[in-house]
Amino acid sequence: MASEAPPFWWDEPDWRALALAPAAWIYGRVSGRRLIRAVPPRVSLPVLCVGNFTVGGAGKTPTAIAFARGAIARGMKPGIVSRGYGGNYSGLHLVDPGHDGARHVGDEPLLLARHAAVALSPDRVKAAEYLKSLGCDFIIMDDGFQSARLHADFSLLVVDASRGIGNGRVIPAGPLRAPLTDQMRKTDALLCIGKGNGADFVIRQAARAGRPIYHAQLRSSSSATVAGRRWLAFAGIGNPDKFYESVRQAGGEVVETHSFADHYSFEPDDIRGLVDMARRQGLGLITTAKDHVRLATMPGVPPEFLSKLAVLDVDLEFDRTDALDHILDTVVERFKSRLHG
């Protein structure tokens, strides 16, 4: 669904949202009821869910990576449970970043596997138990908030500060995966990433519900490569505008942009077109880490293209320096209470 999200979802509600309101009401009733009434199975490990309210990009992957790094810094061994969107594995699979390709396991799991063990499975309990058998002592659930297939001790919902929740309507009238009120009831804290006022409404709703609100920024770790150069920036992610703005914030001049569908599988013609466009205008080519991992594991991609392609790597930085540790502490404390309660 994320790759097919129509642009009108992110604008003020119009006639299309109104026309789809009956279908959205039905979808919302079903998804909201499932979310509220579900009693997900539990595993004997602390579980942090990193999710979002909508389809499309919000910053879940860098958030999951930040928590994996934070857990490792505390002497823990985190494991990540993922569905592997964009891949084709239907059973349990441990991601091998040295051999797996994005078309088989998905781009996000490949990125995550650089930082922690990643188990793919539609059965999230089975994936978590498998990670436990490998010695993992802390589970990060990448997405899965609405699926209710694994109990989370703490659910952190990520929202983009400039994009927010779009028109605030439920699929198919808007990007919400379930009614916001139902999702907020199951939310433990909100993480707002970036600058802007697009998320003001959901921040107010979280505050009214008494949910903690954290703020963070995506900082480029490759500014030395990006700054002072003119770029053709391209991306096949849920929110490409966030990437283009990150290139600018890193000091690059974005002259041209080319947006593809989320999790897009590039074709040879796409690569030739990008190279020709950049050459004609004397621009460098830059893309996201997710797009790069897809391109790097695709058969037939020219090595010279990959060698000249710049990648914008970003790290998540909380505005409050103690925020990450506080959330990790809360997850572990809730797990202990669950275990002994």
UniProtKB/Swiss-Prot annotation:
GO molecular function: ATP binding; tetraacyldisaccharide 4'-kinase activity
InterPro entries, alphabetized: LpxK, P-loop_NTPase
Its job: Transfers the gamma-phosphate of ATP to the 4'-position of a tetraacyldisaccharide 1-phosphate intermediate (termed DS-1-P) to form tetraacyldisaccharide 1,4'-bis-phosphate (lipid IVA).
Pathway: Glycolipid biosynthesis; lipid IV(A) biosynthesis; lipid IV(A) from (3R)-3-hydroxytetradecanoyl-[acyl-carrier-protein] and UDP-N-acetyl-alpha-D-glucosamine: step 6/6
Zinc keyword on record: no
Protein origin, superkingdom: Bacteria
GO cellular component: plasma membrane
HAMAP family, per database record: LpxK
Protein name stated in the entry: Tetraacyldisaccharide 4'-kinase
